[in-house]
Amino acid sequence: MKKSLYTITLFIWAACLLSSCKNEVEDYFDKTASERMEQEIVKYRELLIKPQHGWVMEYYPGGMDQTFGGYALTVSFTANGYAVFRSVLEDDVNNSVSSFYALNKDMGATLNFDTYNEIFHYFSNPDIGDGGGEGKGLLGDYEFILDSGTESEIIMTGKKHKSTIRMHALQEPATEYLRKAKARMNSYLIIPAVSGLKGTFAGEPAEAEFITSQSYILTQGEESTTFSFMFTDKGTKLYAPIELNGKKIENLSWDEQKRAFTTPDGQTNLALVYDPKGLREDQLLGNYVFHYGNDKQIDVSIKKTKQRRHYYGRLTFHCKTQLQRT
């Protein structure tokens, strides 16, 4: 009798459990795709405006291979559709620019910055001379597919160039974060005439070829891989782990004193290869006389325009040249 009673009780419990699961499934699929999408939009609308100090955006332009490394941007969102951007590339990190943002529906929920913002759209403007030059620019995105979101982190993917962009809720005012990140970045960028890295990777000899200031080709033996990084308030952060010859490192730190990228275990130590007699970009600014051909010359002025960090120039003809400062 007891056995029969136990069996009946167990059967009833299992039936209730299955009924509960069924109701949950039915509740979910009772909603149309449009309704589920609207739920996602509402979720992200609430998340975006929640952090007191806004978000730090780990922004990687440079197309699918993140050729130009990453940059710290901060952005705060308002309930009435404004996004306020600041950038580590600004001479004064207190500078901010506001523009509209929108949450839209595509293959999923998307975050779009369609109205021009001088700070943010610098990375996606094809008409600037930086990066790949006019017509390409820095190959950055301004429309993103929202992949996941919590109160502390939002992960999204650029719609055109496919880089993963992460946003973390700031725990301090945006200007404080950017000030620290900028100081760390400048301690690296101030070093002139960098051509690469040399040392060890995971305990074995390795060297890296300079692509851009924050992107390298790392070679060890016959194998090679690329890696890109950015500067945060605490140091450097890789876009993705570096994997080479079966070894993998998740983090790479910039050692300002050693002028090297290292890991805590000491197994990776990649020191900068640079010309100590080289000139920094700020030392090249000024007015020059440009001599070419046998007896031709033209006045040239080298200037730094707002935000630009990459300098490219070309002539439309081959010639022997000489620059003389005036």
Report residues per predicted region.
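Bacterial N-terminal signal peptides that target proteins for export
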Residues: M1-T9
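C-terminal motif of bacterial Sec signal peptides marking the signal peptidase cleavage site
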Residues: C16-S20
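Acidic/polar, low-complexity intrinsically disordered N-terminal segments immediately downstream
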Residues: K22-T110, G149, H161-S163, E172-V194, ...
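Hydrophilic extracytoplasmic domains
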Residues: D27-I49, I249-T326
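N-terminal glycine/threonine-rich, aromatic-flanked beta-hairpin/loop signature
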Residues: M64-G108, G199-L238, K296-T326
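General beta-strand recognition
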Residues: V84, T110-N112, I155, I217, ...
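Extended alpha-helical scaffolding regions
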Residues: S96, I155-T226
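Beta-sheet ligand-binding and adhesion/scaffold domains
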Residues: D114-I190, T236-Q283, Y292-N294, T326
